[in-house]
Amino acid sequence: MEEFQGYLELDRFRQHDFLYPLIFREYIYALAHDHGLNRVILLENVTYDNKSSLLIVKRLITRMYQQNHLMISANDSNQNKFLGYNKNLYSQIISEGFAIIAEIPFSLRLIFSLEGSQIVRSYNLRSIHSIFPFLEDKFPHLNYVADVLIPYPIHLEILVQTLRYRVKDASSLHLLRFFLHEYSNGNILIILNKSISIFSKSNSRLLLFLYNSYICEYESVFLFLRNQSNHLRLTSSGVLFERIYLHRKMEDLVEVFVNDFQGILCFLKDPFIHYVRYQGKSILASKDTPLLMNKWKYYLVSLWQCHFFVWSRPGRIYINQLSKHSLDFLGYFSSVPLNPSMVRSQMLENSFIINNAPKKLDTIVTIIPLIGSLAKAKFCNALGHPISKPTWADLSDFDIINRFVRICKNLSHYYSGSSKKKGMYRIKYILRLSCVKTLARKHKSTIRAFLKRLGSELFEEFFTEEEEFLSLIFPRTSFTLRRLYRGRVWYLDIICMNGLANHE
C-alpha cells in the first residue's frame, strides 16, 4: 500500500497553491494575449529551488513578461458592458489569464516530478509519431484491439470537481465556476459533436486545460489500477504527463480505488495489455482472449460512470481481431494483416514446403478524407479535381508558390510513415496543379502557356528535403532511390496533427 501511495502522491507542500493573488498581476494578462508565447520558456526555467512559493512564481512571470513585450489594446466596438467594462474583451482576457495561472503550478510540478524520477526530458517523446514505432514493435504480437472513444463530461461542474482534486484554492475554483456559467449563458450542459468547446475559439485555452485535467485524472487512475493488477510500474507513462503538462494523481484517490476495485483487479491481470491515446480516442490491445478485453471494457464504463459521472455505453468500445481490423488513428489506417509466404527447402532427396505468415504493421494514408479536407480548403472540388485558390490571387508569385510548397511539404512530412506512397502522389498532384491554376488566374493566362514559360522549375519547388537529399546521392531512375522513397520514416519533431490530416 505504501509503494502505491508513493507512486500517486503529490508533495504535500505543493498541494495548497493559492492562485487568486496572481489574478491581480497585470503581467498575466499581457502573457495571455501574447499568442506567440512558447510555454517551453516555463519548462526551461528549472533552476529554481524545488520548494516553490508564490514569490518564485511571481518572479518567473516577471521574467517571462520581460521576454515578451506586448501591449494590450482595449479598443473594441462592442458596447455590451460587463462590470463597467467591455464584456467580451475583458472576460476573455481574465479567462485566458486564469488559464495561464492554473498551468504554472502544474508545469512546475511536472518539472520536479521528472527530476525526482530521473527521467530524461526529451522533446522527442512528445512527438505523436513516437506512437507508431511502439505500435510496430508491439502490435504484430497481439491478437485483439479495442477502439475506445473517451466520453466527454456533459456538465461543466464535472470539470470543476475534477480540478478540485489538484487545486486547493477555493477562491480560484469559485472564479472558474463564474467564468463557465458566464460563457455558457445559463446553459451548463456541454453539447459535444466535434469539440468540447461551447465557447469561442479565443477561449479554447481554458477549456483545453480543463479537458486535459479531466483526461489526466482518468488516466492516472486507469494506469494506477493497471499497474497494480500486474504488480509492475509502467516506465512509459511519464511521456503522457509530459505531453499534456500535468502531473500524477493525488494520494486521496488511492484509498478510494484500492478499496472499491480490489475485488475486480484479480480478473484483470494481463501483462500484455497496451494502452495508447491521442486526444479523445484511445486504443487497448491485448494478446489474451476476448473475454479479458470485455472485462476491461465494462470496467472502463463503470469507472467513467461511477467516479467521473460521465455517461458512457459499452457500445462505444469496439473489440475486434487485430488481423482483420483497421484502426483509424492519427490520420492513418493501421492494420496487422497476415502476409503468407511460401519457402521451398530441400534436404538430400526430400523437399519441404514451408508456409509462413508473418505479421507486420501497415500504415496507409486515408486518401478520401484527406481529399475531403483539401476540398473544404478550396484546393479541389469534391471529386478531387484541382481548382484555383482565388483568395490567394492577390499575393505575389513567391508567396503563392511558398504557401503551396509549405502545405505540400508539411503533408509529406506528416505522412512519411505510410506503407504505400502512391496515395500521396495524388495529393501532391492536386496541390501542384492548384498552384499552377492560381498563378495562371492571377496573370490571366492559360495553364499550358504558364507551364511552358516556367518549365520544370516550378515543380522542383515541391520536392521535400528528403527527396532533394536523396536525388543528389542517387540517380533519379535508380532502384535504390525508389526503394528509399517507399520506406517508412517516423519523425520525432511532430507534436500535433496536421490541420488537413485531422478529419474529425
From Swiss-Prot:
Gene designation per UniProt: matK
Q: Name one GO biological process term.
A: tRNA processing
Q: Which source organism does the UniProt entry give?
A: Betula papyrifera
Q: What is its main location?
A: plastid
Alphabetical UniProt keywords? Chloroplast, mRNA processing, Plastid, RNA-binding, tRNA processing
The record's comment on protein family reads: Belongs to the intron maturase 2 family. MatK subfamily.
Localization terms from the record: Plastid, Chloroplast
This protein's superkingdom? Eukaryota
Put simply, this protein is called: Maturase K
* Described purpose of this protein according to its UniProt entry: Usually encoded in the trnK tRNA gene intron. Probably assists in splicing its own and other chloroplast group II introns.
Gene Ontology CC: chloroplast
Q: Name one Pfam family in it.
A: Intron_maturas2
Q: What's a single GO MF annotation on this record? A: RNA binding
Q: Which cysteines are joined by disulfide bonds?
A: none
